[in-house]
Amino acid sequence: LKLERGARTALFAPSGYGKTTLAMLLAGYLQPTAGEVLLDGAPLPKTGVCPVQLICQHPEKAINPRWRLARVLEESGALSDSVLDAFGIERAWLTRYPRELSGGELQRFCVARALMSGAQYLICDEISTMLDVITQAQIWNTVLAEAEKRNMAILAVTHNRNLAERIADEIVDLAKIS
């Protein structure tokens, strides 16, 4: 699998085909037992903010429950009013803890955190699966607009063929190659 800056690729397959495992390998969360993951011909950096950011399906597992949400966003650098506004993140939410927000609100924070990191490659692992259709559309429209502005590559990991066709220029069907 090769991702180019600015590309929009969907990794599509039914549940159980290893989509999330592959996403975690590509983002550096797991180490491959064979082969390698390279970024511009070199291994992913081991220190600093990684230019490959993974956004998981379950935002409650990706946020420290003891941190207020402003601190969660500050992990990736300075707060960006334009990103907060784009995702409809209210300033009052910044003083709250994760347990005080809905899953959709938390997912907005996870996506905003990844975008504020200066990522060059964004891996979106089923980021809208459990959200209502309005929140799904808002998140994807914002992610795609930001990716376009920044020439950022998007890898959308999904089991939803309609979503893959709507957001991606290329669809990699794991069921056909595994």
Regions found by a protein language model. Give the residues of each.
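Q-loop/switch helix immediately C-terminal to the Walker
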Residues: 58, 65-79
